[in-house]
């Protein structure tokens, strides 16, 4: 296969989000997970500064919601089929925060497929969640594949979260490895050699999403005391990189 080559990256330099790479999603309808935040494009919630993308969660009444945050995607701008996708991220702290670095295919969910490279919940601070969602096994059915390794102090520093999404790795099947700081901690192989998008849709273009949700089906109970601390409730992203053979 040779070596991985960098094919796309965003280092979040400068003072604004690169519109060639990213869309800013706006809204507060719960996003299918009973989430409690409203995503805005305001600088209070989303900015690029000091070499980082900064998503800040605020407790405030806004558009019939009590929290604001931000969500960005590369939909219809940058998408990829196979490769190594990584982001260097410092997670927010606090009960109910639900940061995520993930990918979606095009079309309707769950048929399009979903790759959750990193999800974290402040109510379980040492846990990172990796997951896949397909038409036959997804979060709505409660039967999707997932793995939740424990990493002490994962919230305290920047870490590199990633996947290696490999075509025909073994036995003619695709495989997706999930990594933290370059270490493979979990993997899921295509169930069989049959191309069936219902149980393995991961052979088409996927786009990247970065967001911080609040509460909802995974985030859990909100602890408003986190908003009274000196440290803001925010996720920092130093860079996002995609490598391919």
What do the predicted segments below correspond to?
Residues 1-245:
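GH16 jelly-roll
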């Amino acid at each position: 296969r040779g070596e991985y080559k960098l094919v796309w990256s965003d280092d979040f330099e400068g003072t604004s989000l690169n519109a060639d790479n990213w869309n800013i999603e706006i809204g507060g309808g719960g996003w299918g997970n009973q989430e409690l935040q409203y995503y805005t494009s305001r600088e209070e919630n989303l900015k690029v500064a000091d070499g980082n993308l900064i998503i800040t969660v605020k407790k405030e009444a806004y558009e019939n919601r009590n929290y604001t945050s931000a969500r960005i995607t590369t939909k219809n701008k940058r998408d990829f089929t196979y490769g190594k996708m990584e982001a260097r991220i410092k997670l927010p702290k606090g009960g109910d925060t639900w940061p995520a670095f993930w990918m979606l295919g095009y079309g309707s969910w769950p048929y399009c497929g979903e790759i959750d490279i990193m999800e974290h919940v402040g109510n379980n601070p040492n846990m990172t969640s990796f997951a896949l969602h397909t038409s036959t096994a997804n979060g709505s059915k409660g039967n999707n594949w997932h793995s939740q390794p424990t990493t002490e102090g994962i919230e305290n520093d920047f870490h590199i979260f990633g996947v290696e999404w490999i075509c025909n790795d073994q036995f003619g099947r695709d495989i997706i490895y999930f990594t933290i700081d370059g270490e493979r901690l979990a993997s899921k192989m295509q169930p069989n050699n049959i191309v069936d998008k219902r149980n393995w849709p991961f052979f088409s273009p996927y786009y990247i999403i970065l967001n911080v949700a609040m509460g909802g089906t995974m985030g859990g109970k909100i602890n408003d005391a986190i908003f009274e601390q000196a440290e803001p409730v925010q996720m920092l992203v130093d860079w996002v990189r995609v490598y391919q053979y």
